[in-house]
Swiss-Prot record:
Residues 114-136 are annotated as: Disordered. Belongs to the universal ribosomal protein uS19 family. NCBIfam families: PRK04038.1, uS19_arch. Keywords: Ribonucleoprotein, Ribosomal protein, RNA-binding, rRNA-binding. The lineage of its organism: Archaea, Methanobacteriati, Methanobacteriota, Stenosarchaea group, Methanomicrobia. It comes from the Archaea. One of its GO terms (biological process) is ribosomal small subunit assembly. One of its GO terms (cellular component) is cytosolic small ribosomal subunit. This is Small ribosomal subunit protein uS19. GO terms for molecular function: rRNA binding; structural constituent of ribosome.
Length: 136
């Protein structure tokens, strides 16, 4: 019996590429050229232009300041890679290190707004059968 070759491809150990371009090549592109590489929804969002609040966040990135933002809809651009940002999740700020794999995604995807609830056991009197349980 012959061995079957694995259909899974080996993981590549190399530099990350986005649509065939390395991070350094992406950082050299203008915003319009980078927008052409994005999926249609993100491309359309960038072509419409940034809001005043988003422009302020981008300006803080360029200055190298520590950035805290409520703008969860801002798209991660190549010039942001390697920096840390704090994104509001509705209750507090979540610290996120921006990696090359995050290019083209939005800030809100990395700061979940809902957490899993783990309820404790029911108290005395919570159900009809527990009314007559003697208290210790």
């Amino acid at each position: 019996m012959a061995k079957k070759s694995s259909s899974r491809l080996p993981k590549r150990k190399g530099e990350y590429t986005y649509r065939g371009k390395t991070v350094s090549e992406l950082q050299e592109l203008s915003l319009e050229e980078f927008a052409e590489l994005l999926p249609s929804r993100e491309r359309r969002s960038i072509k419409r232009g940034f809001t005043d609040g988003q422009k302020k966040v981008l300006h803080e990135f360029k200055e190298g300041k520590k950035v805290r933002t409520h703008h969860r809809d801002l798209i991660i651009l190549p010039e942001m890679i390697g920096q840390t940002i704090e994104i509001h999740n509705g209750k507090g700020f979540v610290s996120v290190d921006l990696q090359p794999e995050m290019i083209g995604h939005r800030f809100g995807e990395f700061a979940p707004t809902r957490s899993r609830v783990s309820h404790g056991s029911a108290g005395v009197g919570a159900t009809r059968s527990s009314k007559f349980v003697p208290l210790k």
